[in-house]
């Protein structure tokens, strides 16, 4: 399962200007004139109605694997910085150290124990910040990844797919 919170920068300049305008209108007690988002976005989270391309792209990368992915896209009221929360279920349990070592070895990834936010870590950053969350067991089969990145600087959806590929390949093969 994957939950992705998109910044308004995904809409380009019109998205960032629209959120700034919504905030200004609401802070000054004026009514909203929404033209970009399907609903008020300032101080709100809006579910995306269209299908994500992430699940089909993951299936294309691993045609021999049966990938059951549920993707939920939410439009977040932040200007920059994408947040992705991915729940990973492995076919077989692995030692926690093996998974941690694999995550540390990923290209352009910084594994972090600190609080990750799209404002601090997803704006004007070219790295992909990742937090590994799991039970305290020695061997784990399920874990959560909390990922924060600036898609404008680090690339588009391909980075998420590339990350998934690097994570899944060593585990599945």
Predicted feature residues:
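C-terminal active-site/capping subdomain that shapes the small-molecule cofactor and substrate pocket
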Residues: 68-173
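Active-site-lining helix/loop region of Rossmann-like oxidoreductase modules
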Residues: 1-101
